[in-house]
Amino acid sequence: MEMQEFVANFANQFDDTELEMFNSETRFRDLEEWSSLIGLAVLNMIAKKYDIKITPAELRSVETIEALYNLVVTKK
């Protein structure tokens, strides 16, 4: 798994936010479109694409897409 692929998969969970808004340093909860529903979609994407289970509490513990990526990598 590579960071760019993870960022793209993460960005695909959003409908209205421009792709240019997403990079490893993006503080995703600061995005206007962020919601608990998108959070669930992100958890589901990680489970399906990477076969990794991230809890809602773990998702809340990270601030950036890179931090979430690192969390996923440590669980592999």
List the predicted regions and their residue ranges.
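Phosphopantetheine-dependent thiolation modules in NRPS/PKS and related acyl-activating systems
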Residues: 1-34, 38-44, 48-76
